[in-house]
Structures are given as structure tokens and as C-alpha cells.
Amino acid sequence: GLSVLLGATQLVKNPLITLDVYSSCEVYGKQFFDQNDHEYTELYEQARKLPNVNYIGYKPNSFIKSNMHKYNMYAYPSIFEETSCISLLECMAGGLYSITTNLGALFETGAEFPMYIPFDNDLRRLSMKFAAAIEASANILHEETIHKHLETQSNYVNAYYNWNKIGTSWTRFLTGAISAKTK
């Protein structure tokens, strides 16, 4: 997905739009980092060289969440069939306008709130779609209807996807499953 996002960023014409990239194999642990990070070196270097991109790399989740208020938008051109997406939920909870693909369960995760870009196996074409979506979205972020949309989105995610509620649901499910098995 990062290659798609960097491609899109190169197509964005608005000089006020910048991309901060928090991407690294380090998020998956030292062993994964050691085995896989070299595969992404060129991509990270490309991000460092682009004029409208700030390559930040790995930062702990707490850092990202505490700095989320500095951002307006979350662009996530997933090219994998995700079963859920915690970063999408956290950005939605933080009130960021979100753009993502409709691949896998991202539509179920984001409900009606994000702008969904139809997935395209042609990643160049997908980059073009994302560039257009980013530019169009940047032009409407100031509108009152968007502010209300983002407030509703944040309230929705905080009500239905908070960890206490999820933990309670799993506890009930597992208790029931264990109880049914022991009968």
C-alpha cells in the first residue's frame, strides 16, 4: 500500500498537501524487522526523497495517537484483504477524514464513514484514484457537513469499538463456548 500512497502523493498538485509516513517493519517486532525490512529499503528511500513527504518511520502507537490532532486526513490504500484495521479505527475515532480501499473487511470496519476507493489490481491506476480522492477531500475538509460527519464518525467508533466493549464481548463469547463444551 505504501507504494500506492507514494505514487498518489507524486500526482497530487496541491502544494499544501503533505504526507507523513509512519511505516516500518519494526512495528511487527525485532525478528520480523531483521528478516524483512531490507525488502522495503527502496520504498523508504523514495519516501525520504519526495518533496511533499516526511518519512518518519516507526513510532509507538502512543506517540501517533497523541499527535493525531495535528492531522486532517488518513489515507490507507490497502492492497491486502484485511479482516479489520486498528489504525483505521483509531484515526476515525480521532476525527480524521479517512480514505481507504474497499478491499477485504475494510468496509465492515469503517462502516459508512470513510471514502472508499474501489480496489484495482493495476496499482498505478489505484494511485491515480487515490491522488484524485486526496485532492477532492482536501477541498471539502473545511465544510460544516464534513465536521459533523467526522464528529458522528468519532462518536460511532468510540461507542462500538472501544477495548472495554470488545473485551466484554469476547469474555461472554468464550465463557459461553467453554460452558457449552463442558456440558
Residue spans of the language-model regions?
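Short hydrophobic beta-strand element within catalytic cores of glycosyltransferases
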Residues: 97-100
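Short alpha-helical donor nucleotide-sugar binding micro-motif in glycosyltransferases
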Residues: 58, 66-71
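A conserved mid-protein helix/loop that constitutes part of the nucleotide-sugar donor-binding site
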Residues: 1-11
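Nucleotide-activated donor-binding/catalytic signature segment of Leloir-type glycosyltransferases, i.e.
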Residues: 23-25, 33-62
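A charged, aromatic-enriched C-terminal amphipathic alpha-helix characteristic of glycosyltransferases
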Residues: 125, 141-182
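Short alpha-helical segment that forms part of, or immediately flanks, the ligand-binding pocket
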Residues: 65, 88-93, 104-108
